[in-house]
Design a protein with these regions (language model features):
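A residue-level structural signature of the nucleotidyltransferase/glycosyltransferase Rossmann-like core
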Residues: 44, 78-79, 101-102, 133, ...
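Short beta->alpha junction loops/turns
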Residues: 8, 62, 146, 182, ...
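Histidine-centered divalent metal-coordination motifs
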Residues: 83, 163, 200
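Pocket-forming structural segment of enzyme catalytic cores
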Residues: 92-181
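C-terminal and late-domain segments of enzyme folds
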Residues: 156, 166-242
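N-terminal beta1-alpha1 cap of cysteine-dependent amidohydrolase-like domains
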Residues: 1-78, 84, 90, 103, ...
Length: 242
């Protein structure tokens, strides 16, 4: 079984429906967990999130989820953080003040710099336009390292993003994929048995569902995050919409 943590923020239902869509052919139950529990009763944990880092981490702690989450990671349970859920895995965030994260993945969450330029839009005169913050829309995933989470994901695949802050990973080996939005930043990471994905898989159509299916395939095979222990996710029985 996979536990999706409900700590009162964001995109819970859409993430649940996306997991449900890929879980059915694998016959892996997906539960929404809205109270602190011993997560080792499940085979993996998903931490979704949408909104401000400070509100999210405060909700998580206020509802008593921090300790059981850390104990689950320490026990080797696979953990997947999505969007703000990914950011919470890092040490700290500078979003609207300084906030302490869960210290699962080394690094910090930082705001996109002001005045970023997009060289890809330069007209003949060489001028570029200023990129807007937040980044909202489709952008590419540039694969940097092999990982079973990214099986069958082509380099340059498009995913859907909506965020003003990015994860600055302290360990280069943690970076699985990067995305260019004025700066080249980590968009998919992994540290031991914890993974994080900045784009919204539930909004990223076939690519997003493939990433979730890959995660579930690893869980089904009993993978606890060892490199190279991938599992075949199988074909996705759903229309390609991008």
């Amino acid at each position: 079984m996979i536990a999706i943590v409900d700590y009162g923020v964001g995109n819970l239902r859409s993430v649940y429906k996306a997991f449900e869509a890929v879980a059915l052919p694998m016959q892996i139950p997906v539960d929404i967990v809205d109270a602190p529990a011993d997560f080792t009763r499940w085979r993996a944990v998903v931490l979704p999130g949408q909104g401000a880092f400070g509100d999210s981490v405060n909700n998580l702690r206020r509802q008593g989820f921090e300790t059981p989450l850390l104990e689950a990671v320490q026990a080797g349970l696979p953990l997947l953080g999505i969007c703000v859920g990914m950011q919470l895995l890092f040490d700290e965030s500078e979003e609207m003040g300084q906030h302490e994260g869960l210290h699962i993945i080394p690094g910090a969450v930082r705001r996109f710099p002001d005045g970023m330029r997009d060289p890809a839009t330069a007209p003949a005169n060489g001028l570029t336009h200023t990129l807007r913050v937040p980044q909202i829309g489709w952008n590419q995933l540039h694969l940097r390292r092999f990982d079973p989470l990214l099986a069958d994901i082509p380099d340059g695949a498009h995913a859907y993003f909506a965020h003003s802050y990015y994860c600055d990973a302290a360990a280069p080996d943690a970076i699985l994929a990067t995305t260019d939005y004025g700066i080249d930043y980590p968009s998919i990471v992994r540290w031991r048995n914890a993974w994080g994905i900045q784009p919204h898989p539930e909004k990223s159509h076939t690519i997003g569902l493939r990433i979730l299916a890959n995660f579930m395939a690893m869980v089904a095979r009993g993978c606890q995050g060892e490199e190279g222990e991938g599992a075949e996710a199988g074909p996705l029985d759903m229309p390609s919409v991008r």
